[in-house]
Structure formats: C-alpha cells, structure tokens
C-alpha cells in the first residue's frame, strides 16, 4: 500500500497542476493535488495496476467492491475513505465516509464540524490553483472563530452567575446611569422600588434570625458574624438603590401641591345672577302689578259694602223689636 500511495503521488502532475503528494500508508489516496482535479478526472477503478504486487491488486479490488459497482471516483475536495471496516453497519460507514471526505475528525464539536463541512467544497474547488498554506490559513481562521465563540459563552455564563451584593451593585449602576435615549417609566421604577423594599425587609428578617441563633458564649462563631456583616453590606446597597429610585421618580413627576389649595373653599354663597329683563318682560311685569293693585282695591270696597250692609240689618232688627214692644 505504501508503494501504491507513492504511485498516486507521482501521477499527480500528469493530471494537470502538480499538487503536494501527501502519502497515506493505509489509504493510498492523496489529500491535495491538482492531478486529481485536472485532466480526465482520475478514477480509482481505472488506475493502472503497474508495479503492483498481486497482494496489493487484491486489496485494491476489495476497496473497489466496497466503493460500489462502478468503482470509487476521486472527489476533488475530499480525502479517500481510509480505514473502512467490513463489519460496520451501512449507516456508520456512510457517516464515516462523509466525515473522512470532509476532513472532519470524530472528536470535533458540532459547530466546528458544520463549519468545516460548509468550507469543504470551497477548499476542494480551489485545489487546482491553490496551495497548502491557504488551506492552513483557513483552518486557523476557523479555529480562532470557534475559540472566540467558546470565550463568549464562558463570559456570559460567568457574568450571569454572580449573586448577592455584586448583582445589587450592577443594578445600582444600571439605575444610576440610565440610557439617555430611553424614557424613564415611573411605573417600572416604582415597582422596582417596591421589590427593593421587600428585599430589605427580608434581609432584616435574616439578620434577626442569625442574631437570635448566636449564643452568649466565649467562643463566637466567625461564620455567623461574617454572614451578618454581609447582610448589612447588602442592606446598605439596597438603601442606596432605593434612594436613587426615589430621586429619579421625583425628577420625573411634577412638583407637589397641597390638596387644600386645589379645592376651592368659599364662606359666602355666590349671588344669584339676575336674568336680563327685556321690554316685553317689563311690560308684563308692570301689568301684573296693576292687576294686583286693582284686586286689592276691589277687596277693600267689598269689605266696606259688607260692613254697611251689616249695620243696616242691625238697625232694621232693632226697629222691629221696638215696634213689638
């Protein structure tokens, strides 16, 4: 097989383009060479079997049988399927063939494997006119990209898992340095302040419970003392946070006005507004007054008539009584 690989390496320039003969002891296929791409597209089944021992010819026939009835055709952007086991399942063989053709190792993460599979055809197309250093540069760029992605993921995980006072300090910085392009929502600030006050109350409960568990002995527990100090440090930061929220809310709302100044208090009732008197209204009102005076006069006259009539009747009755006597 070593000799077979050498024969293929020597036949590379005849196909057109002269690539580097990267020999593989057990596979017999070259990785990069213009001879595989140019010419008539060299096929493994049509390789001349000169300078080959019968044992090597038999191994080549077995490889042709594994590749299919038409023989394995050399792919310009792939490495030959080396190391296929006859006892493997067809699916496993296909996966190994694809991985070997794309040049992806088995231990690579899926992101790098996908990147190399996408870059594989581009590398294969440029094999006839490109050399080995360009492929190495592309591989180095891919490795740098994958390293950057891993560093970003680690940084995100590290920044998201910082509990306690560090998270409170970050929130304080976010509140104290708001985005000028974003408007401050008073409702959200009020809700954040309410949550902060509840957090302060819960921290005080934890402090009281920790102080309650301390026993008045000569040997004090340093862990409890450190825990209480940490609680007080967190409470101090939370109070600063509440103060910042309070200042932001006061700046966003209008000035305070007393409620009594907004309510109009009046001791005396307002005078009634007189209706405008037109000429017709005045005439009717004057006629009404005249009618009232006329009625009063008639009433006085009727009263005088009644009084006179009563006196006359009284005199008539007196005269009749005097006559009978």
Swiss-Prot record:
Highest taxon of source: Eukaryota
Coiled-coil stretches: none
Cell location: Nucleus
Gene Ontology cellular component annotations, sorted alphabetically: mediator complex
Biased composition (Low complexity): 1-11, 109-122, 132-154
InterPro entries hit by this protein: Mediator_Med30_met (IPR021019)
Chief subcellular location: nucleus
Keywords, in A-Z order: Activator, Nucleus, Transcription, Transcription regulation
Gly residues compositional bias, start-end: 158-169
Alphabetized Pfam families for the sequence: Med30
UniProt KW Amino-acid biosynthesis keyword: no
Residue span of region Disordered: 1-26, 109-176
Gene Ontology MF term list: transcription coregulator activity
Any single GO BP term: positive regulation of DNA-templated transcription
SUBUNIT field: Component of the Mediator complex.
Function, in words: Component of the Mediator complex, a coactivator involved in the regulated transcription of nearly all RNA polymerase II-dependent genes. Mediator functions as a bridge to convey information from gene-specific regulatory proteins to the basal RNA polymerase II transcription machinery. Mediator is recruited to promoters by direct interactions with regulatory proteins and serves as a scaffold for the assembly of a functional preinitiation complex with RNA polymerase II and the general transcription factors.
Family: Belongs to the Mediator complex subunit 30 family.
Name recorded for this polypeptide: Mediator of RNA polymerase II transcription subunit 30
Gene encoding the protein: MED30
């Amino acid at each position: 097989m070593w000799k077979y690989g050498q024969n293929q390496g020597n036949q590379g320039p005849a196909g057109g383009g002269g690539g580097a003969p990267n020999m593989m002891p057990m596979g017999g296929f070259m990785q990069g060479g213009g001879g595989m791409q140019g010419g008539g597209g060299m096929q493994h089944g049509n390789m001349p079997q000169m300078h080959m021992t019968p044992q090597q010819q038999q191994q080549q026939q077995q490889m042709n049988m594994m590749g299919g009835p038409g023989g394995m055709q050399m792919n310009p952007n792939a490495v030959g399927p080396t190391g296929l086991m006859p006892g493997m399942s067809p699916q496993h063989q296909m996966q190994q063939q694809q991985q070997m053709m794309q040049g992806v190792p088995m231990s690579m993460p899926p992101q790098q494997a996908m990147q190399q599979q996408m870059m594989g055809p581009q590398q294969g197309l440029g094999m006839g006119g490109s050399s080995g250093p360009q492929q190495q540069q592309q591989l180095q760029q891919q490795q740098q990209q994958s390293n950057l992605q891993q560093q970003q993921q680690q940084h995100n995980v590290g920044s998201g898992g910082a509990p306690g006072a560090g998270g409170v300090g970050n929130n304080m910085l976010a509140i104290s340095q708001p985005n000028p392009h974003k408007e401050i929502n008073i409702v959200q600030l009020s809700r954040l302040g309410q949550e902060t006050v509840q957090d302060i109350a819960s921290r005080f409960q934890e402090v009281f419970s920790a102080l309650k568990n301390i026993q008045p002995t000569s040997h004090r527990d340093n862990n409890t003392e450190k825990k209480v100090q940490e609680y007080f440090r967190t409470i101090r930061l939370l109070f600063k946070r509440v103060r910042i929220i309070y200042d932001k809310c006061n700046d966003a709302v209008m000035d305070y006005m007393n409620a009594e100044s907004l309510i109009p208090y009046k001791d005396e009732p307002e005078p009634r507004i007189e209706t405008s008197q037109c000429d017709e209204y005045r005439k009717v009102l004057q006629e009404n007054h005249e009618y009232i005076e006329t009625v009063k006069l008639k009433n006085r006259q009727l009263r005088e008539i009644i009084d006179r009539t009563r006196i006359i009747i009284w005199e008539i009755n007196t005269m009749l009584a005097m006559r009978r006597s």
